From Swiss-Prot:
The active site is at 124 (n6-amp-lysine intermediate). It catalyses: NAD(+) + (deoxyribonucleotide)n-3'-hydroxyl + 5'-phospho-(deoxyribonucleotide)m = (deoxyribonucleotide)n+m + AMP + beta-nicotinamide D-nucleotide. This is DNA ligase B. Catalyzes the formation of phosphodiester linkages between 5'-phosphoryl and 3'-hydroxyl groups in double-stranded DNA using NAD as a coenzyme and as the energy source for the reaction. HAMAP family: DNA_ligase_B. Belongs to the NAD-dependent DNA ligase family. LigB subfamily. GO terms for biological process: DNA repair; DNA replication. Keywords: DNA damage, DNA repair, DNA replication, Ligase, NAD. Signal peptide: none annotated.
């Protein structure tokens, strides 16, 4: 009873999550969006099944198909089936292909395994499914999966694949096998290399009219022997003896979801001879083959890998002005999970880069993780029917603007505050962008150092600043007064690296003001261009005004 209750709760939670992400579209907009995506997926289906080619990555196809199903659940009573079968498959399978139900996560798998025994895990090889029929010890027929009941006659093609045994003996002499035709790989590491569009490549080779030598680049992984030996160990031994060695090599007994998770993680990182997209857990005990029907296999389930890249909906386009005045564009996303990391924002880059990408709210983009786990955009995989792009701010800012607050300077001014509070500058721990915005909104700073004048009472009464932290914040602000002169100059945005600034041995504001361009040019990593920037910086009226203000506050190095 508890198991069924847990399953029911999972279903209800899943349904709630689906409805929670329904787009806020009018019926007309929903109809148009669904129709456009339906047509695109139909075109991809036709390319895949009729011509053996694919213009889209397998993972993108799968995720956009799931997105279409989600939209249809929101606005239409009956979603379409994805992965349409070939229209001209006419050869009956001796035993139907059942397909495999997908488990959402480890918990769901654990529930499924709880009341079952004699379970085995296999890699979910990424290719195209096939039936191999042996009669009197010879390969009699090979049939594509099709709709599970009927498929294409692939006998001629499969007979040219050297990895498929053409003759067998013993219990296999008159047998029906089901498996996956895959692209042979040498040392494929799924974690690093991803899916490489393997499924579409295999389909392309099998659909071509010419009998190319490239068929020998294919292999076969047998995952089912309907009505075969009762013991899994006997099945594996007979298959290996006949030449289907991969099945025995990559089939392991498991008792619980923890063991499956360990094997799944091992194969995710290991060098394998094929591309995979997860694992399949199956019971050794199967019903008689006459009871096999598409979509009705209760003795096996799949636990797929999380995609290396995820399709994410763009919720909004936002613009940020950095401390140097450069405008950057950020896409706010509907949350997706990448390698256990929740991704809700991705940096697009400059305004020009954003315009080249042509991204608008409502579009679907492919996101992955670059080095150090930083989200990046790989592609725009779908653009909405109605696209409205925000207008970027005027490019009026540079490295010498917005030291003093104004309405037009809001974003660059905040960026300067965030920069000066960072560990490498003044080290104002405990305050980030949100805190600086709260302080500026309440106390209306005149310039980037106005926070030095805040009292403990003012900090305590600032909305958005916890009273328990206000005293600590005031203490850090007060300690900042004792920071070395070079730290304050960095806070003012001097266009030098810390190494160059330290090498200058400048210890006072007056000394710095009298330094020449030739002096700066001699510093490590500082050429003539950077030296001119330093001169422009120290002669800027806002910088001079800030220097005088810090002198009045008796900051070290600025005193007259």
């Amino acid at each position: 009873m508890k198991v069924w209750m847990a399953i029911l709760i999972s279903i209800l939670c899943w349904q709630s999550s689906v409805w929670a992400v329904c787009p806020a579209w009018s019926p007309a907009r929903a109809q148009e969006e669904i129709f456009r995506l339906q047509q695109q997926i139909k075109q991809w289906d036709d390319d895949y099944w009729k011509e053996g080619k694919s213009e889209v990555e397998d993972g993108v196809y799968d995720q956009l198909s799931a997105r279409l199903t989600q939209w249809q659940r929101c606005f239409v009573s009956e979603p379409r089936d994805v992965m349409m079968p070939p229209l001209n498959g006419a050869v009956m399978h001796p035993v139907a292909h059942t397909g495999v139900r997908k488990m959402a996560d480890k918990n769901a798998l654990s529930l499924w395994m709880r009341e079952r025994s004699d379970l085995w895990v296999q890699p979910k090889v990424d290719g195209v499914a096939v039936t191999l029929v042996y009669r009197d010890g010879k390969l009699n027929k090979a049939i594509s999966r099709g709709n599970g009941l009927k498929g294409e006659d692939w006998t001629q093609k499969v007979s040219l694949i050297s990895a498929v045994p053409q003759t067998v003996s013993g219990p296999l002499a008159n047998s029906t096998l089901q498996g996956e035709i895959f692209l042979q790989r040498e040392g494929h590491i799924q974690q690093q290399m991803g899916g490489i569009n393997a499924r579409a490549k295999v389909a392309g080779l099998m659909m071509r009219q010419d009998d190319s030598d490239t068929l020998n680049s294919l292999g076969v992984f047998v995952w089912a022997w309907p009505d075969g030996p009762q013991l899994m160990t006997d099945r594996l031994k007979e298959l290996a003896t006949a030449g289907f060695t991969l099945t025995q090599r990559y089939t392991r007994a498991v008792k619980n979801a923890d063991e499956v998770a360990r094997v799944r993680n091992e194969w995710w990182k290991a060098k394998l001879p094929f591309v995979t997209d997860g694992v399949v857990v199956r019971g050794a005990k199967e019903p008689e083959s006459r009871h096999w029907l598409p979509g009705q296999a209760e003795w096996l389930v799949a636990w797929k890998y999380q995609p290396v890249a995820q399709v994410a909906k763009v919720k909004a386009i936002q613009f940020a002005v950095g401390k140097s005045g450069k405008i950057s564009v950020v896409a706010s996303l509907a949350p997706v999970m990448l390698d256990d990391k929740k991704v809700q924002r991705v940096n697009i880059g400059s305004v020009r880069r954003w315009q080249e990408w042509d991204i608008a709210p409502g579009d679907q983009i492919l996101v992955s993780l670059a080095g150090q786990g930083i989200p990046r955009i790989d592609d725009v995989v779908w653009r909405g029917a109605e696209r409205t792009k925000p207008t970027p701010p005027e490019n009026r800012f540079n490295s010498l603007t917005c030291y003093f607050a104004s309405d037009v300077c809001q974003e660059q001014f905040i960026s300067r505050l965030v920069w000066l509070g960072s560990k490498q500058v003044l080290g104002l721990d405990g305050i980030g962008e949100a805190g600086w915005r709260a302080l500026h909104q309440t106390h209306r700073f005149e310039h980037i150092f106005s926070w030095l004048l805040l009292t403990p009472e003012q900090l305590q009464n600032t909305p958005g600043i916890a009273k328990s932290k206000s005293a600590q914040l005031w203490h850090r602000f007060n300690l900042a007064r004792k920071q070395p002169f070079t730290r304050w100059v960095m806070a003012m945005g001097i266009p030098l690296t810390r190494a160059a600034l330290n090498a200058s041995d400048e210890r006072s504001w007056s000394q710095l003001l009298f330094s020449t361009e030739q002096f700066w040019q001699q510093l490590p990593g500082t050429g003539s261009g950077r030296a001119r920037q330093v001169i422009e910086w120290k002669e800027n009226a806002q910088i001079k005004k800030l220097g005088s203000w810090l002198a009045a506050q008796q900051i070290t190095g600025f005193e007259p």
